[in-house]
């Protein structure tokens, strides 16, 4: 089964029907199925934080993340101290880039798992040499 990494922009687009890439996220998901999706606790924290100011989507995103934890086709990579420190080193080394700490951690997960494609609209993934499925 093909494996892809899912970034923040993908999950936000799926849960928010008004998101500019919602239709594309839904369409690409259907096109690449069956697929095993890897994501990370850091990514999901970003997703939850993006809806923290309230409204109906806050409840929806909380429910989505809960469902992901029991979905056999989704692997959520836990945040470890070692991963955080390694991502921080990469973040510091990439001072010429506008990569976030979560981006750096995501790149490391993708490299460790030998995943080349990301469900993302974030050009930083292409800049780091990965295929972006939502661009």
Annotated model-derived regions:
Residues 12, 48-52, 72-73, 91, ...:
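Short amphipathic alpha-helical interaction patches enriched in hydrophobic/aromatic residues
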Residues 75-117:
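Active-site neighborhoods of divalent-metal-dependent phosphate/nucleic-acid chemistry enzymes
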Residues 10-11, 46-47, 86:
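A general alpha-helix detector
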Residues 36-38, 72-75:
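Short loop->beta-strand "edge-of-pocket" segments that line small-molecule binding or catalytic clefts
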